Amino acid sequence: MKKLAFVLALSGAFVSTSALAWGPDGHRAVGAIADKLIKGTNAEKHVKELLQPGESLEGVANWPDCVKGNYCGPQSPEMVEYVNANPKHQEYHYTDVPFQFDHYHDGDVGTADDDIVQTLKQAIAVLQGKDTPQTNPHHFTRRQALILITHMTGDIHQPLHVGAAYVSKDGTFVVPKKHGDIDAVGIFDSRGGNNFLVDDAKIEKLALANDIPPGEPKPEKPGVPKNLTKPFHSYWDGTTVNYAFRRLRTKTPDQFAQTVIASHPAVTMNTGDVSTWPYQWADDTLIYSKQAYADVTVGPLTPQVSKKGETYYTWTMEVPANYPVPSSAIAKNQLIKGGYHLAALLEAIWP
């Protein structure tokens, strides 16, 4: 593909690996699709029993992200209790398998006991009634398990929440063979792509040049300077979803859900025991992780200092000139799969 080189200005901002996969609209879209697909089923009956009056899968889809801070509003007692009982809850949202891999295997480099595949497997077991210290080490309640499944099924379909990029000082992608290889000397963890910085404004220009319809003007906060760059992870979390919505001429998650369901998408459904489905989803997402990193170019390492005085490293990133088109197409398809797979999982648990 023809490439357009970006000269990227470095941002001093630091974003954690546990960034909000798909962003609020993406997660709500996954939940909205599932809400519509399970309507009138036994699964819907059980979902309603676990949710509070007026709640829906769309409405609770962002709950596991909202517990990370106050950006959704004040923390509820339920959120505080969950956070206190799950000190590693931010690690539940992703796994860091090298994107060059084809499969997720327990114990491989980048996997962890508290990663997204293990969390989904545990939450599924809880809804199946398999609540033992071995199957439910975090003591998730049935309501928590449902909410986590709703959210994590979205997360696991986000390419950068499964396939991780490891990089050398000069910006070469490398594949660590074991956890100890990632030593921040020869091999660096890009933190889910958060330490790769892309030029936000230039990518938007590329989107418009590739006939992606213009979006709504972004509100600016008085006195707050606009960041010139954004993490590559944030691009995949939010920008690709925004482009996907714009390409379908939809503005809300519900509109997106209605539009894609009406198109009767061909979605490959999972087979086998539902406890294996998170593994199948991770393997499938690795296909798109490879595509996310295809034809991008990473510059040399640049040291940065966080507000806490900690040193971390960033790399500038160049993307192909048409990158907004394939990346937003991937986002659309992954959101659709997330919604359909969530509905199928709930119906498999509650036939």
Across the structure, where does each feature detected by a protein language model lie?
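Sec-dependent N-terminal signal peptides
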Residues: L4-A13
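N-terminal signal peptide c-region/cleavage motif recognized by signal peptidases
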Residues: S16-S18
